[in-house]
Amino acid sequence: MAVLAVGVSACGNDKSNAIPEQLCGVAITPELTAPLLPDGDDVKTEPQSPRKDEYAQCTVSVGGKAALYIVEYSGQNSFDALEHARDASAFRNPQKAKGVTNAVIADGKFIAVTPCGEGKKSHVLDIDMNMPSSEAMDLRDELERFATSYLPVGKKVIGCEK
Protein backbone atom coordinates (compact mmCIF):
# COMPACT_ATOMS: atom_id res chain seq x y z
CA MET A 1 0.00 0.00 0.00
CA ALA A 2 1.31 3.41 -0.88
CA VAL A 3 1.93 5.75 1.99
CA LEU A 4 1.05 9.38 1.54
CA ALA A 5 3.32 11.84 3.30
CA VAL A 6 1.45 14.76 4.80
CA GLY A 7 3.17 17.67 6.46
CA VAL A 8 2.22 19.02 9.85
CA SER A 9 -0.12 21.98 9.64
CA ALA A 10 0.97 25.44 10.63
CA CYS A 11 -0.83 24.98 13.94
CA GLY A 12 1.28 21.94 14.74
CA ASN A 13 -1.85 19.78 15.10
CA ASP A 14 -0.80 16.35 13.77
CA LYS A 15 -3.35 13.95 15.21
CA SER A 16 -2.25 11.18 12.82
CA ASN A 17 0.26 10.09 15.47
CA ALA A 18 -2.66 8.88 17.63
CA ILE A 19 -4.25 6.80 14.84
CA PRO A 20 -3.39 3.11 14.70
CA GLU A 21 -2.06 1.64 11.46
CA GLN A 22 -4.99 -0.79 11.34
CA LEU A 23 -8.71 -0.06 11.50
CA CYS A 24 -11.25 -2.85 11.44
CA GLY A 25 -8.51 -5.40 10.70
CA VAL A 26 -7.36 -3.46 7.62
CA ALA A 27 -3.99 -1.74 7.27
CA ILE A 28 -4.58 1.97 6.65
CA THR A 29 -2.58 5.12 6.17
CA PRO A 30 -3.09 7.21 9.34
CA GLU A 31 -2.60 10.47 7.43
CA LEU A 32 -5.63 9.65 5.25
CA THR A 33 -7.76 8.78 8.27
CA ALA A 34 -6.86 11.78 10.47
CA PRO A 35 -9.03 14.40 8.72
CA LEU A 36 -12.13 12.22 9.22
CA LEU A 37 -11.76 11.93 12.98
CA PRO A 38 -12.37 14.50 15.70
CA ASP A 39 -9.45 15.62 17.85
CA GLY A 40 -8.48 13.15 20.53
CA ASP A 41 -5.88 10.55 21.38
CA ASP A 42 -7.99 7.52 22.24
CA VAL A 43 -8.74 6.06 18.77
CA LYS A 44 -10.22 2.56 18.95
CA THR A 45 -11.72 0.08 16.54
CA GLU A 46 -14.72 -1.70 17.99
CA PRO A 47 -15.92 -4.70 15.97
CA GLN A 48 -19.71 -4.84 15.86
CA SER A 49 -19.46 -8.36 14.49
CA PRO A 50 -16.59 -10.83 14.16
CA ARG A 51 -14.75 -10.42 10.85
CA LYS A 52 -15.85 -13.28 8.62
CA ASP A 53 -15.14 -14.18 5.02
CA GLU A 54 -18.22 -12.39 3.75
CA TYR A 55 -19.03 -9.74 6.35
CA ALA A 56 -17.27 -7.24 8.59
CA GLN A 57 -18.68 -4.33 10.56
CA CYS A 58 -16.90 -2.06 12.98
CA THR A 59 -17.01 1.34 14.59
CA VAL A 60 -14.01 3.63 14.86
CA SER A 61 -14.33 5.79 17.96
CA VAL A 62 -12.35 8.67 19.39
CA GLY A 63 -12.59 9.33 23.11
CA GLY A 64 -15.41 6.81 23.41
CA LYS A 65 -17.57 8.53 20.76
CA ALA A 66 -18.30 6.86 17.41
CA ALA A 67 -16.64 8.68 14.52
CA LEU A 68 -16.74 6.24 11.57
CA TYR A 69 -18.84 3.19 10.76
CA ILE A 70 -17.27 0.77 8.29
CA VAL A 71 -19.23 -2.16 6.86
CA GLU A 72 -18.03 -4.62 4.22
CA TYR A 73 -19.95 -7.39 2.48
CA SER A 74 -18.71 -9.85 -0.11
CA GLY A 75 -20.72 -12.33 -2.13
CA GLN A 76 -23.38 -9.70 -2.88
CA ASN A 77 -25.41 -9.10 -6.01
CA SER A 78 -24.18 -6.09 -7.92
CA PHE A 79 -26.22 -2.89 -8.01
CA ASP A 80 -25.75 0.63 -9.27
CA ALA A 81 -24.30 2.61 -6.35
CA LEU A 82 -25.43 6.01 -7.68
CA GLU A 83 -29.00 4.83 -8.29
CA HIS A 84 -29.05 3.32 -4.79
CA ALA A 85 -27.75 6.57 -3.28
CA ARG A 86 -30.35 8.65 -5.09
CA ASP A 87 -33.10 6.39 -3.72
CA ALA A 88 -31.81 6.37 -0.12
CA SER A 89 -32.44 9.27 2.22
CA ALA A 90 -29.11 8.72 4.03
CA PHE A 91 -27.14 10.09 1.07
CA ARG A 92 -26.90 13.89 0.93
CA ASN A 93 -25.70 15.30 -2.41
CA PRO A 94 -24.53 11.98 -3.94
CA GLN A 95 -22.21 11.95 -6.93
CA LYS A 96 -20.00 9.38 -8.61
CA ALA A 97 -16.68 8.92 -6.84
CA LYS A 98 -13.43 9.30 -8.75
CA GLY A 99 -11.16 6.32 -9.29
CA VAL A 100 -13.74 3.58 -8.59
CA THR A 101 -16.13 2.64 -11.38
CA ASN A 102 -19.23 1.95 -9.25
CA ALA A 103 -18.87 4.16 -6.18
CA VAL A 104 -20.60 7.17 -4.68
CA ILE A 105 -19.39 9.94 -2.42
CA ALA A 106 -21.92 12.00 -0.47
CA ASP A 107 -21.87 14.28 2.55
CA GLY A 108 -20.48 11.94 5.21
CA LYS A 109 -21.02 8.72 3.29
CA PHE A 110 -19.21 6.54 0.76
CA ILE A 111 -20.35 3.34 -0.90
CA ALA A 112 -18.57 1.22 -3.51
CA VAL A 113 -19.81 -1.91 -5.28
CA THR A 114 -16.92 -3.71 -6.96
CA PRO A 115 -16.25 -7.21 -8.30
CA CYS A 116 -15.24 -9.76 -5.68
CA GLY A 117 -12.52 -11.91 -7.18
CA GLU A 118 -13.19 -13.73 -10.43
CA GLY A 119 -16.76 -14.69 -9.52
CA LYS A 120 -19.89 -12.81 -10.46
CA LYS A 121 -20.62 -11.64 -6.92
CA SER A 122 -19.66 -8.22 -5.59
CA HIS A 123 -17.96 -6.61 -2.63
CA VAL A 124 -19.71 -3.65 -0.98
CA LEU A 125 -17.83 -1.12 1.14
CA ASP A 126 -20.08 1.27 3.08
CA ILE A 127 -18.50 4.03 5.21
CA ASP A 128 -20.47 6.52 7.29
CA MET A 129 -19.08 9.49 9.18
CA ASN A 130 -20.80 10.21 12.47
CA MET A 131 -21.12 13.98 12.16
CA PRO A 132 -23.69 16.45 10.87
CA SER A 133 -23.82 16.52 7.08
CA SER A 134 -23.09 20.26 7.21
CA GLU A 135 -19.65 19.42 8.64
CA ALA A 136 -19.14 16.26 6.59
CA MET A 137 -19.70 18.05 3.27
CA ASP A 138 -16.40 19.88 3.80
CA LEU A 139 -14.64 16.50 4.11
CA ARG A 140 -15.89 14.81 0.94
CA ASP A 141 -12.48 14.76 -0.75
CA GLU A 142 -10.81 13.41 2.39
CA LEU A 143 -13.46 10.69 2.81
CA GLU A 144 -13.08 9.70 -0.82
CA ARG A 145 -9.26 9.47 -0.52
CA PHE A 146 -9.57 7.36 2.64
CA ALA A 147 -12.23 5.06 1.17
CA THR A 148 -10.45 4.46 -2.15
CA SER A 149 -7.26 3.66 -0.23
CA TYR A 150 -9.13 1.34 2.18
CA LEU A 151 -11.09 -0.48 -0.55
CA PRO A 152 -8.43 -2.72 -2.16
CA VAL A 153 -6.88 -3.67 1.18
CA GLY A 154 -10.30 -4.38 2.71
CA LYS A 155 -11.18 -6.59 -0.27
CA LYS A 156 -8.04 -8.66 0.32
CA VAL A 157 -8.71 -9.02 4.04
CA ILE A 158 -12.30 -10.12 3.50
CA GLY A 159 -11.20 -12.66 0.88
CA CYS A 160 -12.20 -11.04 -2.42
CA GLU A 161 -8.66 -10.60 -3.66
CA LYS A 162 -6.07 -13.28 -3.11
Can you name each region flagged by the protein language model?
Residues 13-162:
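A small/polar (G/S/T-enriched), proline-flanked helix-loop surface module common
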Residues 6-10:
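C-terminal motif of bacterial Sec signal peptides marking the signal peptidase cleavage site
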Residues 1-2:
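Sec-dependent N-terminal signal peptides
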